[in-house]
């Protein structure tokens, strides 16, 4: 059995249709030797300081520089604070089940740095060690999918693409968290936020 992972439900269902995986299950499609499942975009993110045992960073804690970085399930804000996204939690369990039931994996996430990061983060988070290959397509036509499946790429060919996305993500974390906590320490207020993108944009329009 071969697992296929996409980063959108509609993409997964379309690929499943093309490959003849027509049986619908909870969170995946199966049939013709395939189990096709999906994420809801990026369901994982870099962990927050409290996940490293730092509840309220003091001056001596700076700079925050985790080694290694940890991953966590995406959180959503509620009336009682930030909690794990239940949809992400449930779908991660489905993906783990699908991966466990298959011998090999095809990464069919978006053909981009972000798409590569979605798969690699999930692969790391689940501590998966099964062999995988990459489906690299820019169209969901039957012809494009079938051609891509006939010409699957070695996952290692996209290592540099993942490293680029991962480095950008970690740089955003380092800049955003350190700068935001630092300004909160300086001003004595807790509602300040700085970041690689938002700060120059706000400066440009102010």
Predicted regions: what is each one?
Residues 6, 168, 172-206:
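Prokaryote-biased recognition of long, low-complexity C-terminal linker/tail segments
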Residues 1-169, 173-175, 200:
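Intrinsically disordered, low-complexity regulatory segments
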């Amino acid at each position: 059995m071969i697992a296929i992972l996409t980063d959108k439900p509609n993409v997964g269902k379309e690929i499943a249709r093309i490959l003849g995986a027509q049986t619908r299950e909870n969170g995946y499609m199966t049939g013709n030797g395939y189990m096709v499942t999906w994420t809801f975009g990026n369901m994982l993110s870099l962990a927050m300081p409290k996940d490293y045992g730092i509840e309220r960073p003091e001056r001596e804690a700076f700079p925050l520089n985790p080694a290694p970085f940890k991953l966590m399930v995406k959180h959503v804000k509620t009336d009682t604070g930030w909690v794990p996204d239940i949809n992400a939690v449930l779908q991660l369990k489905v993906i783990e089940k699908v991966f466990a039931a298959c011998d090999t994996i095809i990464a069919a996430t978006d053909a981009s740095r972000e798409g590569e990061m979605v798969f690699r983060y999930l692969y790391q988070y689940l501590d998966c060690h099964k062999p995988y290959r990459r489906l690299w397509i820019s169209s969901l036509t039957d012809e494009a999918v079938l051609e891509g499946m006939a010409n699957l790429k070695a996952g290692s060919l996209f290592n540099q693409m993942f490293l680029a996305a991962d480095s950008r993500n970690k740089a955003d974390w380092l800049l955003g968290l350190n700068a935001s906590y630092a300004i909160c320490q300086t001003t004595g207020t807790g509602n300040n936020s700085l970041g690689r993108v938002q700060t120059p944009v706000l400066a440009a329009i102010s």
